[in-house]
Design a protein with these regions (language model features):
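Extracellular/periplasmic ectodomains of large secreted or surface enzymes and adhesion receptors
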Residues: 40-47, 53, 270-297, 301, ...
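Basic/polar N-terminal segments that are highly enriched at the extreme N-terminus
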Residues: 6, 11, 35-43
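Bacterial N-terminal signal peptides
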Residues: 22-36
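Beta-propeller domains with acidic blade repeats across secreted/periplasmic ectodomains
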Residues: 37-408, 825-827, 832-835, 839-846, ...
Length: 862
């Protein structure tokens, strides 16, 4: 079933030949419909008066466009996708095409369209190389093509890189392409959903991996001498060099760790993400902004779903598919790297979906527009031209910051075989200087200083970084022809890691913990156990140690087969053990996501009910675990805690929040409505079942005047301002039926998994963005949370988010809006249609006071 602005076409799978009458009629209908759509479509808003944006094509001239570039004659080449999640009954060509787009009469509109190349699948990127070679990336290969006889059809093809993997998701394989000044090629590889892979170059050099996340690779323009440049990405979908030779990428975000990132990519850099530890990005062994030892921070956060980064007119232009806009980032030197400040130059509506951009010979910027928010190809598309209203754009180095003294030093450290200041550089406060020294050690195969002679924690960390990169090259890299480099002794590696685990510097021990977990070095489990038991172990290191031990104890390294029940049992054994240090028990309890049963539940209830003056952080965490997922088994415990005036008010109020979600909650809370502790009484009143708490209720004590319309995010942001009580926000998030947040979302690892995990989201994205999502839930639905109406063969319809296939791909699981999981046999699915609305209900703010909203935002800033 295709649904096109009211036009519905039902096609039975396998019954429509490529040249059938149905296909012809369908094409005519689509062309007519889409031409009408374009005629009424408004161009996106240009927020900077220096620029103008104009349409280049009609709706069906080039459809579902992805990448674009200009050939050696200045003509536009555009990837036209026909395979990206191709829907049932799709009437387009069977393969992707590269279209040659020309304006032959000079009126600014394209009027000539020819196919330069076709036959590819999941085609992602395209860039002009040297001479007349055009470089193309699909998810499975990088190749180059050219037209040798002048007929405007590519007739020469050379494969440069091949990705051998079972992974087949359209856009998390190979993608981004960029050429350095010396002609060498950089290629981005996405997280590949953790599937094992081998990237093989034309000369037989290769790199293998599994579960580490995305990486950036380097090879010659002919596909030789493959090497890894940097790692720790989710999906470095777009790559570009600025005029000073800095390499930037835009990186899509994990499910629960926005924002997406603009990153200054440096040799041997690790940017923190590991797919093996899950999609959320919140695992203790993952980070997103350089929080973990040995990782590097982002240059800036970007809009949702950035697809490419393009240098133009003195700035880095980023196409934000998810937020319907073009952002311009201005690099600002910060030591040996660049941060960036941003501004929105073009903002469109929900039908502006920019993917790629290419500076044209005439000084304009050509932009591809996917148009629709749906991932499957849909037969629509646009090309836009952005130009300066007056004069030409800045070119060359004009407008770009020159390399700072720190950046120049970093390049020398990375390139020189034996710089005199390498040891000092490893001790430098700037992580990018230290990383450059590491890159130099790796490139020169330089010997490492003796561990016992190093007295500086940063230098020790640098030695570990270099040793690990060398170890990765030995284990996962292959030389031209397939030969291995000389292997470093595993025994030496493990001896070094054992010493690092015992080091007094937390940064050193933290890096060792992560390395041991990443490589599943089970022989060093005793060292992790000693670290967990030691009184001197820093509290902030404990979650990583616990997570590493859990990973070593897993039967499989495949994150798709992760045994979460076994993790919960191991954590229970720690937090129920009164002989362990309280801070270790607290760390384990915070990592516990589910209320246990049987004997562990009794132990949890005893901790939660502990007397005042005891270990309050542990007791408070126990109450919150019980309250976040209350069941009939814990009702009595929560009632006793809530009613016990001898306990701290905060603990009692959290128990009240849990009681409000239980049956007969109103009766349970009746005696607490006038409790002597204001915090308890207020929570009971505000969260009691049946209390809708409209904006005019007494709870809304600071509300003032008429409320803005839901679409006026700026007015709402100004109205609510800053502040708020995060403790009250937690109780609202998990308690009662007014906000209903915990039915779909989680905070701090507690809650449901229907929607994204929200811990710290307002701190990272800003209050306005979070408010917009709450006020207008259907404005932008992340692709991972796209709901579908699934019609079954018996006529039933299931509305929900697809979670996974099971039973050897014979069934599919869906999560519905109320958190219910429904399993459906795949053979019984007749068709599915993406819903235009979110499963998050609209109008939630109508049942919340201004104080409620402030408190929720304060919680989400933590």
């Amino acid at each position: 079933m295709a649904r096109l602005h009211g036009l519905q076409i039902r096609l039975r799978p396998g019954t429509v030949p490529k040249t059938s009458a149905v296909a012809v009629i369908t094409g005519i209908l689509l062309s007519t419909t889409f031409a009408a759509v374009l005629a009424t479509a408004d161009p996106p808003d240009v927020l900077d008066a220096r620029y103008v944006i104009e349409p280049v094509t009609n709706a069906t001239d080039v459809v579902t466009p992805v990448g674009c570039t200009h050939d050696h004659r200045g003509r536009l080449l555009v990837i036209e996708s026909h395979t990206h999640q191709r829907p049932e009954g799709y009437a387009g060509p069977p393969h992707d095409r590269i279209r040659l787009v020309e304006d032959t009469d000079g009126d600014g509109r394209a009027d000539r369209f020819r196919t330069f190349h076709e036959g590819t699948r999941f085609t992602m990127g395209i860039r002009l190389g040297s001479g007349d070679w055009i470089y193309v990336a699909t998810r499975a290969e990088v190749f180059r093509i050219r037209d040798s006889d002048g007929d405007d059809v590519a007739d020469q093809r050379e494969q440069l890189l091949r990705l051998d993997t079972a992974g087949d998701y359209p856009h998390n394989g190979l993608g981004g392409l960029a050429f350095a000044a010396d002609g060498t090629l950089r290629v981005g590889l996405g997280e590949n959903l953790g599937a094992s892979y081998t990237l093989v170059a034309a000369d037989g050099s290769s790199w293998a991996g599994e579960g580490e996340g995305g990486s950036v690779f380097r090879c010659s323009p002919t596909g030789t001498e493959l090497s890894r440049v940097a790692t720790g990405f989710w999906n470095p979908f777009g790559l570009a060099f600025d005029p000073a030779g800095r390499l930037f990428t835009v990186d899509n975000d994990p499910d629960a760790r926005p924002p997406c990132r603009l990153i200054d990519v440096v040799a041997t850099g690790d940017y923190g993400y590991r797919f093996r530890y899950g999609r959320s990005g919140r695992h203790p062994l993952q980070c997103w902004d350089g929080e973990l030892s040995g990782t590097l921070p982002m240059a800036a956060g970007t809009g949702e779903a950035p697809c490419n980064v393009v240098p133009y007119d003195g700035g880095l232009w980023v196409t934000s598919w998810g937020h319907n806009r073009l952002e311009v980032f201005t690099p600002v030197v910060d030591g040996a790297t660049c941060r960036a400040t941003s501004r929105i130059v073009v903002q469109g509506d929900h039908e502006f979906r920019p993917v790629d951009a290419a500076p044209a010979p005439d000084g304009s910027l050509l932009i591809t527009d996917w148009v629709d928010r749906s991932y499957p190809v849909h037969g629509r598309g646009r090309l836009w031209r952005l130009r300066l209203a007056q004069g030409p754009p800045r070119t060359g180095a004009e407008g770009w910051p020159p390399l700072s003294a720190g950046e120049q030093r970093a390049r020398r450290l990375a390139d020189d075989a034996a710089p005199a200041d390498r040891s000092a550089a490893l001790r430098d406060a700037d992580p990018f200087i230290r990383q450059a020294a590491v890159a130099g050690i790796v490139a020169a195969h330089a010997p490492l200083p003796a561990w016992e002679r190093i007295d500086d924690g940063r230098e020790k960390l640098g030695v570990l970084l270099a040793r690990r990169w060398q170890d990765d090259v030995d284990r996962y890299g292959r030389l031209p022809g397939g030969g291995k480099t000389e292997s470093l002794a595993t025994a030496d590696r493990d001896t070094l890691l054992a010493a690092a685990l015992a080091d007094a510097d937390e940064r050193v021990a933290s890096f060792a913990v992560r390395w041991i977990a990443d490589e599943r070095i089970t022989g060093l489990r005793p060292g992790l156990e000693r670290l967990l038991a030691a009184d001197a172990t820093p509290t902030q290191l404990l979650p990583a140690v616990l997570a590493a031990l859990d990973w070593l104890n897993q039967d499989s390294a495949d994150p798709r087969r992760y045994d979460r029940a076994a993790l919960q049992r191991r954590l229970e054994a720690i937090w129920t053990d009164a002989t362990r240090p309280p801070r270790v028990r607290l760390a384990a309890l915070r990592m516990t996501s589910d209320v246990p049963k049987g004997k562990p539940l009794s132990a949890l209830a005893a901790i939660a009910s502990g007397p005042a003056g005891g270990d309050e952080p542990l007791a408070g965490e126990a109450v919150r675990l019980l309250a976040a997922k209350p069941t009939a088994d814990v009702a009595v415990t929560l009632e006793e805690i809530a009613a016990n005036a001898a306990l701290p008010a905060a603990r009692r109020a959290d128990a009240v929040a849990g009681l409000t979600r239980l049956p007969q909650g109103e009766a349970r809370l009746a005696t607490l409505l006038a409790d002597a502790a204001p915090e308890v009484a207020a929570t009971a009143r505000e969260l009691a079942p049946g209390n809708a708490a409209p904006a005019t209720s007494p709870a809304a004590s600071t509300d003032r005047g008429p409320r803005p319309a839901a679409h006026d995010t700026a007015a709402w942001t100004a109205r609510l301002g800053a502040g708020g009580d995060p403790e009250a926000g937690w109780r609202l998030f998990f308690g009662g039926r007014r906000a209903r947040c915990a039915e779909c979302h989680a905070v701090g690892g507690r809650g449901a998994a229907v929607g994204p995990e929200l811990s710290g989201i307002a701190r990272r994205m800003g209050r306005s963005r979070v408010l917009e999502s709450l006020l207008q839930p259907a404005r932008e639905v992340g692709p991972a949370f796209q709901p579908y109406a699934v019609t079954l063969t018996d006529g039933r319809v299931v509305n929900g988010i697809s979670v996974a296939t099971n039973d050897r791909d014979r069934t599919e699981r869906f999560l519905t809006a109320d958190g219910t999981e429904v399993t459906v046999p795949l053979a019984e699915i007749e068709h599915r249609v993406p819903l235009a609305t979110s499963i998050m209900p609209a109008g939630l703010e109508q049942g919340l006071s201004d104080d409620d909203l402030r408190n929720l935002l304060a919680l989400l800033e933590q």
